[in-house]
Curated annotation (Swiss-Prot):
It comes from Rattus norvegicus. Its cofactor is Cu cation; Zn(2+). This is Extracellular superoxide dismutase [Cu-Zn]. Residues 1-15 form the signal peptide. It catalyses: 2 superoxide + 2 H(+) = H2O2 + O2. Keywords: Antioxidant, Copper, Disulfide bond, Glycoprotein, Golgi apparatus, Metal-binding, Oxidoreductase, Secreted, Signal, Zinc. Glycans are attached at N114. Residues 224-244 are annotated as: Disordered. Binds 1 copper ion per subunit. GO terms for biological process: blood vessel diameter maintenance; removal of superoxide radicals; response to copper ion; response to hypoxia; response to oxidative stress. It comes from the Eukaryota. Zn(2+) binds at H138, H146, H149, D152.
Amino acid sequence: MVAFLFCNLLLVACGSVTWTMSDTGESGVDLADRLDLVEKIGDTHSKDLEIWMELGKQREADAREMHAVCRVQPSAMLPPDQPQITGLVLFRQLGPSSRLEASFNLEGFPAEQNTSNHAIHVHEFGDLSQGCESTGPHYNPLGVPHPQHPGDFGNFVVRDGRLWKHRMGLATSLAGPHSILGRAVVVHAGEDDLGKGGNQASVQNGNAGRRLACCVVGTSNSEAWESQTKERKKRRRESECKTT
């Protein structure tokens, strides 16, 4: 597009020079030719303006920071004796071509286990009419085996019933044809075997077990992310103070 714009500007310059030279010559060009040249120059300027405006829109889109929030709640179909997990999953993407980052802040896991691993994935549908069971399979727009699905976030370590984690460089996106907006994030009861379980379920969902809690990803402003970032920095400072 930039090359096309340069060519147009060059043509306008050449046309202007030709006209100027013809004005100084003996014969020159007739009035009709001059009017035709003026019209062509005007059309070229209009096209150039449109191109510049489109380039400006593209730059604005590339620079637009996107945010999303997912408010996790226990599955409506979950038996009462199961963990009641709640919390927030926040997303930030600096631009459509940037890698996604996410902040996970969940609680309600069994505290008596002290530490455990739980899988978290993006599922295809944002349908919670039957709790987390109606969110469908893993979101897999490219038809690849698990754990290469764009929303395969992997395993998260839970300590004392709490999960607090920040991850960067995630393969999924808030923009484009494979956006996860409107889709579900699901917290599982078990650990993801990362496709190494040796059965069909392993390459579909990692044998991650029951769906404990879920939410639907929706657009948001930056306030929740900024608040979470401040809290994360505060926790890091407190942790550093304890170790010194």
